[in-house]
């Protein structure tokens, strides 16, 4: 599954940010609906995907909710006076996370959302059908990537929180938490056309990694990793 300061270890105190007047704080169970909402509002390559999906929670079923439910210690949100407006989510051990989803998350979603016919070309699928296909056939991390960069992350911020260095602060917060839990490395995927995001990750210490199309969730994605 692919879609960012604590001072040391697993220190999870709330951290103020500058300019945005937002707080980075640990995820709470009551934030689950906010994860779904933000995932949808940023689901069209950072833009609002509400008009694209018949089921407004479908995107969050895949990209957001499992992290809050199964990896809450590695989930942080950004909250301002208007409420929660961003999150950073991670899995410590991607292979173990994938296995857990196979046991406890995907089965009920597969029963709810039919798998589109294998013969249906991707370009003919609706956005709902694209996500349904991913639910039935989720990408699995290659062994070589899991060996060095076993953790992965997603970050999404609503437009009102996209300035002032908040993404960088959230990334630092998560990286500190991952180090505190002993992760040797973290990876993420970025759309190949999003050079702004690619530049951001390079700037904060990620390195682009070579990967074949078969080793990526989708051929248009770039793979980045960071040793911790």
Please report, for each region that a protein language model flagged, where it lies by residue.
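Conserved beta-strand in the GNAT
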Residues: 77, 83-92, 139
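Conserved acyl-donor/pantetheine-binding loop and adjacent beta-alpha core of acyl/acetyltransferases
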Residues: 95-154
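Conserved GNAT acetyl-CoA-binding A-motif
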Residues: 149, 178-191
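Active-site rim helix/loop that mediates acceptor-substrate recognition in acyltransferases
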Residues: 53-75, 81, 138
């Amino acid at each position: 599954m692919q879609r960012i300061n604590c001072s040391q270890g697993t220190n999870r105190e709330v951290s103020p940010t500058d300019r945005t007047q937002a707080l980075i704080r640990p995820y709470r169970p009551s934030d689950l609906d906010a994860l779904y909402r933000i995932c949808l509002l940023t689901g069209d390559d950072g833009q609002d995907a509400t008009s694209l999906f018949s089921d407004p929670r479908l995107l969050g079923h895949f990209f957001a909710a499992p992290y809050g439910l199964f990896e809450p210690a590695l989930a942080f949100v950004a909250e301002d006076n208007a409420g929660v407006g961003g999150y950073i989510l991670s899995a410590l051990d991607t292979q173990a996370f994938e296995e857990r989803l196979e046991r406890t998350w995907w089965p009920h979603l597969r029963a709810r959302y039919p798998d589109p016919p294998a013969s249906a070309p991707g370009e003919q699928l609706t956005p709902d059908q694209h996500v349904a296909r991913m639910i039935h056939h989720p990408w699995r991390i290659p062994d070589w990537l899991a060996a060095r960069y076993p953790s992965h992350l997603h970050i999404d911020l609503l437009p009102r929180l996209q300035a002032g260095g908040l993404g960088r602060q959230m990334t630092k917060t998560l990286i500190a938490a991952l180090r505190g839990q002993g992760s040797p490395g973290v990876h993420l995927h970025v759309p190949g056309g999003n050079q702004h995001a690619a530049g951001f990750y390079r700037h904060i210490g990620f390195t682009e990694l070579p990967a074949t199309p078969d080793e990526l969730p989708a051929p248009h994605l770039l793979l980045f990793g960071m040793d911790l």
